Amino acid sequence: MVSSGYPPIMNDLIRRLSKLPGLGEKSATRIAMHLLKMSRTDAESLADAIRELRSRIRTCSRCFHFTDAEECSICADPARDTGEICVVETTADLLAIEQSGAYRGRYHVLQGVLAPLDAVGPDDLRIRELLERIDREGAREVIIATNPSSEGEATAHYLLKLLKDRNVRVSRIAYGIPMGGDLKYTDRFTLERALKGRQAF
């Protein structure tokens, strides 16, 4: 509950800021206080940047990653392997894989996962577009990189069922013990996946 000691305009800003992920009322209040201390020029530049973000950023027409053009820079890059499509839940997942530098194919962002309890079904995701894209582009391999949550696993199995009759190799990213990790602190699910996904040494 926002303090009644602030003017209504500030209360409204704090309330709106506290809706952002990772921000509670205290953090939102600190940000609001900081905004008041900023120069008018800096505050207006920030407001302009938010307006630009909302008006110019859209999703790539091919993979549904964020972009300010018709296609994102990854889809437009001729050096990328067009035969591989890595399927991820969100743009944040795409960026995590990109930062690893371990993948040089293209992506497909589902924009979520199957979540029946939240009324999210196949028609709410970019699954139809994925199937059309595989057929249109003649992909050799689809790498399913959904998260190892129950929803991510359900989505992966649903995709596998749809893709099994298509002429495309389907793989799932491996999960295991992180580098520097300690087995005694690793959860049962991760240990099970690591053991099932073991490789010859």
From Swiss-Prot:
Superkingdom of source: Bacteria
One GO molecular-function entry: DNA binding
Signal peptide: none
Keyword Cell membrane part of the UniProt annotation: no
Keywords, comma-separated and alphabetical: DNA damage, DNA recombination, DNA repair, Metal-binding, Zinc, Zinc-finger
Zn-finger segments (C4-type): 60-75
SUPFAM superfamilies on file: Recombination protein RecR
CDD domains registered for this protein in UniProt: TOPRIM_recR (cd01025)
UniProt KW Metal-binding keyword: yes
Residue intervals of the Toprim domain: 83-178
Any one Gene Ontology BP term: DNA recombination
InterPro entries referenced in this protein's UniProt entry, alphabetically: DNA_Rcmb_RecR (IPR000093), Rcmb_RecR (IPR023627), Rcmb_RecR_Znf (IPR015967), TOPRIM_dom (IPR006171), TOPRIM_RecR (IPR034137)
PROSITE patterns reported in the protein's UniProt record: RECR, TOPRIM
Family note: Belongs to the RecR family.
NCBIfam families: recR
Function: May play a role in DNA repair. It seems to be involved in an RecBC-independent recombinational process of DNA repair. It may act with RecF and RecO.
Protein name, entry field: Recombination protein RecR
Species this chain originates from: Syntrophobacter fumaroxidans (strain DSM 10017 / MPOB)
